[in-house]
A protein has these predicted regions:
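Sequence-structural signature of the catalytic-core scaffold of metal-dependent phosphohydrolases
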Residues: 2-155, 164
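C-terminal subdomains that position terminal phosphate/3'-OH groups for nucleotidyl transfer/ligation
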Residues: 144-192
Length: 192
């Protein structure tokens, strides 16, 4: 994206709209994931042909690049019509200016990502010697409740299971707000 901003390379963007230029100059992995499954993978069949609900779970940031804060967004201009279709199909309320409420299942997908990345990053830290097994167990103690003598896999498994239970409880507790599109926080209250 920095390459396109260099004066010698801006001519490559000459035929694009300002919004398309914004997409290219603010490349975002979340938007690319939607583009990839909706059109690039199995492109001859029109993408992976996932259900609207499956695509909805990918949308942590259901807005375009011009609405992005901190660079996070899910919709390139090339997927804007798809997003409008998904919003209509899934009943996602428009928040105006190419911005929609999140699909309720996106909160569960986000929590699953958080659980896996956080716990596996800690496990990797033990394996490469950055974190001791004692510190690993101590960090995950609120989720795992096992002794420091347990192996990494057991601690991970128990911590993931308990984190999932926590997410389910939070989802149930805030179900009405989630379904109304009013939740603006993570479901996982992770201890580390």
């Amino acid at each position: 994206r920095e390459w396109f901003k260099q004066p010698a390379n801006t001519h490559y963007l000459a035929t694009l709209s300002e919004l398309e230029k914004s997409d290219i100059c603010t490349y975002e992995g979340n938007a690319h994931s939607l583009r990839r499954v909706a059109s690039l993978e199995m492109y001859e069949e029109g993408g992976m042909r996932l259900t609207a609900a499956s695509l909805g779970t990918l949308l942590k940031y259901p807005w375009t690049s011009e609405q992005a804060k901190k660079g996070k967004f899910n919709i390139y201009q090339s997927e804007l019509k798809l997003m409008q279709h998904l919003a209509d199909t899934l009943g996602l309320k428009s928040l105006g200016n190419n911005r929609w409420q999140r699909h309720p299942l996106s909160y569960l997908m986000e929590a699953a990502d958080d659980i896996c990345y956080a716990i596996l990053d800690l496990e990797d830290a033990v394996e490469i010697g950055i974190l001791s097994i004692d510190n690993f167990c101590q960090t995950l103690a609120p989720l795992s409740k096992v002794s420091k003598h347990a192996n990494l896999g057991m601690v991970r498994s128990i911590a993931v299971n308990n984190a999932i239970k926590q997410v389910v409880a939070q989802f149930k507790e805030h179900y009405s707000a989630i379904m109304a599109g009013g939740v603006r926080y993570h479901l996982l209250k992770f201890p580390c």
